[in-house]
Amino acid sequence: MTHTIKILPEYFNPTAAGKKAFEIRRNDRNYQVGDTLQMKEWNGENYTGREIQCYVTYFINESKFGIAEGFCVLGTRTIDIIIPKKKRK
């Protein structure tokens, strides 16, 4: 299953750079290992056009390791990064 979700710039950048390979999310979508995340960068007002697509490789829910109720940690592996070219004026 593919889940389209928002991602803020402060999390998009380290994910795109390969420094962040996890997501902490509200577990309201029945995430499963093998799912695809389509993460669209959201700057608080608009989508920027930048996207990251990744596989869910690992899943931990709130019953483990002190994770808050209703949340989960998703291990991720990047498939693709989409950064639109800037338009020339």
Positions of PLM-derived features:
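Catalytic phosphate/metal-binding cores of nucleic-acid and nucleotide-processing enzymes, i.e., regions
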Residues: 1-89
